Amino acid sequence: MLIFPAIDIIDGKPVRLFKGDFSTAHQVAGDAVETAFGFLKAGCKWVHMVDLDGSLKKEPVNAQTFINVAKETGLRVELGGGIRTMNDIDFYINNGISRIILGSVALKNPELVKEAVKEFESKIAVGIDAKSEYVATEGWVEKSDVYFTNLAKRMEDVGVKNIIFTDISRDGTLTGPNLEQLVEINNAVSCDITASGGVTNINDIRKLKSKNLYGAICGKSIYEGTLDLKQAVEA
C-alpha cells in the first residue's frame, strides 16, 4: 500500500482544515518544497497536494507551488482542487504533475472525466468525498443525493482506474479512517482505492493495509506527530 503524505495549499502555504471547514484553516509548515523534501527523506514516492483556493475559485490558483514541488523534489505529485477543464489538466501534466484528481467535476461533468481518461489514462484519478455516505462537492460545501458507491461505479464505467475516497466527517480529526465505507467502495468497483481522512497512527495504516487498498493519505497525523511517516512507509 502506498503512503501519500498530504500538503493542502492556501495562498502558497501548507495548511490543514478540520472536517473540510475553511474557517478552521491554519498553517502547518513554512514552505511546500521544504515539507515535501521531508517526505522524500522518509521514503515516500508520492505527495498528495490540494489547491484549496482553487477548490473555491473553481480554477487553478497555486499552480507554481505544485510545479515547484514536482520539479525540485522529484516526488510524484497527485493534485486536486479547481481543475475543471482539459486545458487545466493538460497544463499540469505538461508541467510535471503525475496524476490529476478530478473532484466536483466528476459528478457535474462526467463527460470531461471520460475525455480526460481517454487522453491521459492512469494519470487521471477521481476524488469522491462523502458526507454521511452521500457525495459532497465544491470544496465540500454542497451535498448531493448521489450515494458514494453509485458515483464510483459511474466513474469505473467511463474508464477511471483510480479513486480517492474521503469521509469528510473524519478528515483532519485524527479519529481513525472509515473502514466500513472503504471496504464497501473497494468491493463495489475494481478501481484502485486510496483512503483519505481520519488516519491517526501506525495501527490505522496496518488496518487499511489489511483491506487491500491501493493507498492511504496522511495529513494531520504527520504534522501533529501521531504518525511516524518512515514507519508508515515501511509497514
Task: Report residues per predicted region.
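Alpha-helix-loop-beta-strand connector modules within alpha/beta enzyme cores
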Residues: 57-78, 114-129, 174-201
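Conserved anion-binding
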Residues: 12-15, 19-23, 97-171
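C-terminal helical cap(s) of enzyme catalytic domains, especially alpha/beta-barrels
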Residues: 112-119, 124, 186, 209-235
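Structural preference for beta-strand elements that scaffold enzyme active sites
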Residues: 2-6, 46, 74-78, 98-101, ...
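Conserved, mostly hydrophobic/aromatic
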Residues: 8, 39, 47, 92, ...
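Catalytic cores of alpha/beta
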Residues: 73, 77-98, 180-215, 232
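Glycine/small-residue-rich loop that forms an oxyanion/phosphate-binding "nest" at active or ligand-binding sites
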Residues: 53, 58-117
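Glycine-rich, proline-tolerant flexible connector loops at the mouths of alpha/beta enzymes
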Residues: 46-62, 104, 165-175
